[in-house]
A protein has these predicted regions:
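Polytopic alpha-helical membrane-helix bundles and their juxtamembrane interface segments
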Residues: 1-46, 54-75, 80-207
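Conserved phosphate-interacting/catalytic interface
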Residues: 51
């Protein structure tokens, strides 16, 4: 395996491990805020997607095409799960309870639309578009509490902004030394995931 593919695979696996750890720590959290469950789903979705993408990177040209395609489709679906979890968590922590059912219905509809077209998705762009459209909504929902100095919201807004930097690096194609733009994207995204985790850790009933 070329060095570039090896590093990309390892950083994918690092994201998977990090996300699994975060999900496990949140699951063990006593007296969890209802929004925490959505973020656990989000971290699990990211973990599965990263694991499948890393395996996909390492298996190109080595496994039957049908297996490669299955890995790809699994990754696309897992990112949809991550998007759903993030949005569910954001709604439960920011939207007034009288509106939460309507907001959750909108999230389910968005996810169903994405899943219905996921089988035809042959590039990473559609998954990234869904994932980061979810992040944009998360940002909008947390801006006001962040400005009001709610610690959890400030961490989550920070996570979205760091993710935006990661996307910018990915799009730029910047590849210093032996690292590719994909590797940098993964490393920066790990910082964003840590921000999300810290924010979710601090959820209170008042968030």
């Amino acid at each position: 395996m070329p060095l570039a593919e090896l590093i990309t695979t390892l950083t994918d696996y690092a994201i998977a491990l990090q996300s699994l750890i975060f999900a496990g720590l949140l699951w063990q959290k006593p007296d969890r805020h209802p929004a925490v469950q959505g973020w656990i789903v989000a971290f699990l979705g990211v973990a599965i997607a990263a694991l499948l993408r890393g395996t996909w990177h390492s298996s190109l040209g080595q496994l039957p095409e049908a297996v490669i395609n299955s890995l790809w489709q699994g990754m696309i679906l897992s990112l949809g799960l991550a998007s759903f979890g993030m949005l569910a968590g954001a709604v439960q922590s920011t939207v007034p309870r009288r509106w939460q059912n309507w907001a959750m219905l909108a999230i389910f509809t968005k996810s169903l639309v994405y899943l219905s077209g996921a089988s035809a998705c042959q590039t990473f762009d559609c998954a990234i578009a869904d994932y980061f459209s979810a992040m944009l909504i998360v940002l909008l929902l947390h801006i006001k509490p962040a400005l009001n100095r709610v610690a959890s919201a400030r961490w989550i807004v920070g996570g979205v902004l760091v993710s935006a930097i990661a996307v910018g690096v990915e799009a730029s194609g910047f590849s210093p030394g032996f690292l590719t733009h994909n590797d940098l994207y993964h490393l920066i995204q790990m910082v964003a995931l840590y921000n999300f985790f810290r924010g979710v850790q601090q959820f209170r009933d008042s968030t």
